[in-house]
Amino acid sequence: MRYLLSLLTLLGAAAMAEPPTVLVFGDSLSSGYGMDVDRSWPALLQERLVEQGYEHRVVNASITGETTEGGAARIDDALSRFAPALVILELGGNDGLRGFPPARIKDNLRTIIEKSRARGAGVVLLGIRIPPNYGPRYTRAFEDVYRELAAELDVPWVEFFMQDVALDEALMQDDRIHPNEQAQEVLLENAWPAIKAALESLQVSGRSAQ
């Protein structure tokens, strides 16, 4: 009887265990701005994970208008609340459009990455590009932020998250800044190889069970 009770307790605990979390931590490119959030790329990512047999749940903690400084300020709370196995980091576009110093952007992204890893989470970095409003020197320095961080911290990354979207008017909203609903599948395809590789790496290391 004691063995049976112990077994039932273990089975009950396993049944109540929450699936590992994939945390999307971004800005309006990921928040579902201007569309039904159920058709945003993070929502499509959840569908993709289910289709491919992953047990992970996707939590979208993206905020429209968010900067890297804002993200760095709230990452601790997000990590405590959701205990993610994987953080998909998509920030920096608002910083670049406002001409914030690339060094500051890099420091903020580094903080988010390092804090996520310190909590045991893997990280995927989604690279952003901006129009050359501030000249070629600033534009290059901004783009180098993602490349350099990926190399320095050995972070899986996507060089240009908005590839095949940013210059296609049919996939952009009227403001020519935000992707529309039709673009979400393209964004998912851009990010998916890095996300899948990160999930497989976490499974090998055993961290996906968190």
Pin down the residues of each PLM region:
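Positively charged n-region of N-terminal signal peptides that target proteins for export
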Residues: M1-Y3
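N-terminal signal peptide c-region/cleavage motif recognized by signal peptidases
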Residues: G12-A14
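Serine-esterase "nucleophile elbow" of acetyl-processing enzymes
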Residues: M16-T64, R74-A83
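Alpha-helical cap/lid subdomain in secreted, periplasmic
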Residues: L44, Y54, G70-Q210
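Acidic-and-aromatic substrate-binding clefts and catalytic sites of carbohydrate-active enzymes
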Residues: G65-E69
